[in-house]
Amino acid sequence: MSPTDSPDSPDRSASSDDRDDLDRPVLERSQSWRDLHVLLANALRHPDEQFSDAIETGEFEAQLRSLVSTLDVDLAISLSPPLEESSGLTAAYIDLFEGRRQPYAPPAESPYRAWYDRDEGGLMNGPAAAEMRQRYRAIDATVPDAYAADHVALLLEYESLLLEAGDHDAYRSFARSHFEWLPALRRATDAAAAEAPVYRWLVVLLDELFVVLRDRLELSEPTTADVERMLGRIGPDG
């Protein structure tokens, strides 16, 4: 099965021609957008030797610059990762994203979202994670044990599969419904105790790229009130 057979398919009432016109800035360079999603997904996984080497040698920056140039994306943030010892990436990841230092920034969607019939949040494995497990089952995929089903790296990877499958309706719907929390992740990262310069930079980069992507897909930005509610759900300590 393809990702487009997953649950919660987008409303297809709009004509195909209308949707293609709306998504054309992404449609025309879908392979490059897919590659950018994969690049960022790999960067936001637990750091491994390949990622550490790519940061240290400049390979990651070179790939990022090439894709951003191809996609004609203009960002205020530098495309050069901050200097950080590659040996410290694992500690930085755990400090910033997994709560070894408080406050921290949960890198999964559920904590920022309302918990089923209540507005409270702050917990892992909420409705977003349950939906993602359904989506993975629909494509005969499994969630890696080390990650929440709605971890940002897995969401990016799933988005890349939608682009690869060529279903831009599903891609647009998924971008709208599963990445609205990125501004809250950025705010939580700003307030986190960990230094983690590379991962702080990656979170800002991701958030700014999705501002561009929403604009090209004509999706609305999350409101300030929405972001504040999301931050309130994770609490002062992440």
Task: Give names to the regions the model predicted.
Residues 2-238:
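Charged, alpha-helix-forming regions
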